[in-house]
Amino acid sequence: MPDTFFQPVSGFELPRFAGIATFMRLPHVGLLDKRLNDVQIGLIGTPWDGGTTNRPGPRHGPRQLRDYSTMIRAENGATGVRPFELVNCADLGDVGPNPADLHDTMARITDFYQKVK
């Protein structure tokens, strides 16, 4: 029996356009959350433009993916697979970058991922 905490919010329970956007309408589990060790697949955003030149905007990617992913369904229509019943997935939030300091941003990303391990 899958842990219902890690199931996406149903569109029947809360319309897809409502609520706080998380990746695929999964629960948000922060680094200090007691359920962090139960997460098997954690989705992490890194809203940062420093990896591109002449193309600002990647910093908006994680937020947009969260918004667009609200349309994901709990069951794959072609295969019938219900992936969220197979593993515990959660949105672990964003790494907080330092837009003015590349080295500090890399240290923050490294620190965030080490805390997730």
Language model features by range: what are they?
Residues 2-117:
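Metal-dependent C-N hydrolase catalytic cores
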